[in-house]
């Protein structure tokens, strides 16, 4: 976001008991699509090649720890947390020890986790929603392009009955 290419950017790790999806999401103006994708790929490559430096680790810890209480604020978020604990066979100690566990994560462990969890930049799948005429040729550099109109039945929920 510091490059001014996006309105927002985030990555989401689908936490399951088996490997899941890692999603990088962003919203950018059409003319900046390729530049934003290239930047995301370069960040992913840097994570694989160099991991996080001490400043990056501290920043990530602060962000993750700061967001954790919001996972316990509402009835819905508590229900999600209970489901998460059950799914992963965790108890209350997960919540009680979350901060200390996060603080104890060593840079080497973080680097190993990045290598195991985040996809290789050469094996990415892109889902782009936007002006196909404006980005079609430019995004072809990432691989074969399949276009689906937003009016296709698979994109549109069935009408209410």
Q: What do the predicted segments below correspond to?
A:
Residues 1-49, 54-107, 112-116, 120-129, ...:
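M16 family metallopeptidases and their MPP-like homologs
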Residues 71, 128-161:
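An aromatic/glycine/proline-enriched structural segment found at the starts
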């Amino acid at each position: 976001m510091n490059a001014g290419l996006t309105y927002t950017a985030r990555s989401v790790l689908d936490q399951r008991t088996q490997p899941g999806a890692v999603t990088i999401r962003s919203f950018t103006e059409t003319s900046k699509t390729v530049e934003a994708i290239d930047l995301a790929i370069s960040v992913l490559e840097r994570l694989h090649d160099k991991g996080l430096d001490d400043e990056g680790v501290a920043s990530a810890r602060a962000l993750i720890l700061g967001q954790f209480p919001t996972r316990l604020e509402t009835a819905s978020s508590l229900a999600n947390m209970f489901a998460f604990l059950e799914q992963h066979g965790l108890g209350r100690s997960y919540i009680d020890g979350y901060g200390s566990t996060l603080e104890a994560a060593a840079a080497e462990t973080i680097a190993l986790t990045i290598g195991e969890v985040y996809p290789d930049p050469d094996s990415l799948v892109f889902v782009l929603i936007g002006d196909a005429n404006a980005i079609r040729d430019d995004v072809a550099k990432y691989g074969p392009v399949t276009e689906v109109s937003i009016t296709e039945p698979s994109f549109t929920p069935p009408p209410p009955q």
